[in-house]
Amino acid sequence: KDEHLFFRDGKYLNAKDEKGGKVFWSRGNGWVLGGLAEVLKYLPEEDKKYRPFYEQLLQEMSEKIASLQREDGYWRTNLLNADIYPMPETSGTGLFTYAIMYGINQGILPADKYLPIVRKGWDAMVKAVNTEGKVGWTQMVAQKPGKVVKKDTRAYSVGSLLMIASELYRYLDNNK
């Protein structure tokens, strides 16, 4: 709770990374933040029981996640100790960028603060698209932070790129 991040599961509550830090996995936290956006899509605006809780969680987590974005626009697989695996990673980056853009579009997150984060994330994701149209720098199926190589690709990174694109389109269409 203090970190405004989520452990992958109970096995990681006391786990430590190579530097003795807490283990907060990028893609796992991407599932949470992206999941919050998806939940909010289906909660009615007038819901006073659950909607405020999920909106606040999206706000708090987005603030923390934004602070962890690297200069190149990507997040690393180990969110709090990015230098352990310093290479870019697209599955977490895509989910974070999507959820933050959703939050902007819904008025949950302020555009002036978060659009620069989205721009950097979008640019990073686009740079990861190779000549075959695949999104590289994707951590393979895993359960914790780990090494990533440029050629690694999975459909879930393409999916998050398309989700970001749909939210960017919505934003641009509404702000002509």
Language model segments and positions:
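Glycine- and aromatic-rich loop/turn segments at beta-sheet edges
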Residues: 1-20, 64-84, 127-147
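A short glycine-threonine-serine/GTX helix/turn-capping micro-motif
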Residues: 19-27, 148-152
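Early exported N-terminus immediately downstream of N-terminal targeting peptides
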Residues: 35-40, 62
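Amphipathic alpha-helix from the class-I
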Residues: 39-46, 103-107
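Long, repeat-rich segments with strong aromatic
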Residues: 43-44, 51-70, 82-94
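Extended, well-ordered alpha-helical scaffold segments
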Residues: 46-65, 110-126
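CBM-like carbohydrate-recognition segments
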Residues: 75, 87-176
